[in-house]
Amino acid sequence: TNKKPHIPRILMITITLNQTEMQMATLNGMGRLVQNQTNGVSSNGRRKLDPDIIGTGGEIAVARYFNRYPDLSIGPHRRGYDLEVNRTTIDVKTTTFNPGYLQAKTTKKVSDADMYILVHASFPTFTILGGVRAAEFLQDYNIKDMGYGPNYTLEQSQLHSLKSLFVK
């Protein structure tokens, strides 16, 4: 039969940044870019807007969804998360690819963040695609090489809705 595989539907949340948030993302992203260059860290991949600006925009969108202020600190921070909600630490990953992949470096540990959330960016509009708990994501069987070296990788269709991840 030509039956399509079942892909769980997740509720996607779209957030369009306002003028102030766009300026915050741009200024903060430029600051992070300079800091990363100073530290010898470079972002991989080619994108239309600087990955640091896109990443900051994704963090702002997720923070707004949870009615929190984003952490816009610039500089090397040792902690492995971007946001904390109800004692759950969250690492926000932003992509310009659609469908997107949630990816994290193989140096990540479950203790770095409790949850990973994938956001699609079409600046200034960001769509929260879903998330996954670190213990489920950071498993050897999720390590794949998509052309940039081995990373923990999940397809967008493997993610869970935020609502299901935050069920009490």
Describe the predicted segments one by one.
Residues T1-N86, K93-K168:
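Nucleic-acid endonuclease domains
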